[in-house]
Amino acid sequence: MGVVHDVWLVTKELLEATALPWPSEEREERLAAVDRLLLEREELLRKLRPPYSEEEQELGREIIVWNQEIEARLLRVCEEIRRDLRMTGAKRQANARYVHPYEQPLSFDGMFYDKRR
């Protein structure tokens, strides 16, 4: 089976590595593992050459199904990271407003606005 079987094995490892949920404490290690597996699989995919036997075609179909699941899981992780970044930014702004309350006016109520200038 050769290269197709190797791609299948790496894809299976990748599927297991992307299993949800991803606790924020483990996120860095899991992202590093996923990145390593993706690079390994990319190298193997470059070595793929037809013709494929019936068994290799069956493995290929399974790889395609797994790949769709992996993509969906990675998109969810990406959304979690984006949400965490937004929350961190909001917390930082709220903390800055609390520490320095008069640096930026919160509202412009009662301020005179000259339309001509």
From Swiss-Prot:
The keyword Ribonucleoprotein does not apply. It comes from the Bacteria. Keywords: Bacterial flagellum biogenesis, Chaperone, Cytoplasm. Its main location: cytoplasm. It is found in: Cytoplasm, Cytosol. Disulfide bonds: none annotated. GO terms for biological process: bacterial-type flagellum organization. One of its GO terms (cellular component) is cytosol. May act as an export chaperone for the filament capping protein FliD. Homodimer. Belongs to the bacillales FliT family. This is Flagellar protein FliT.
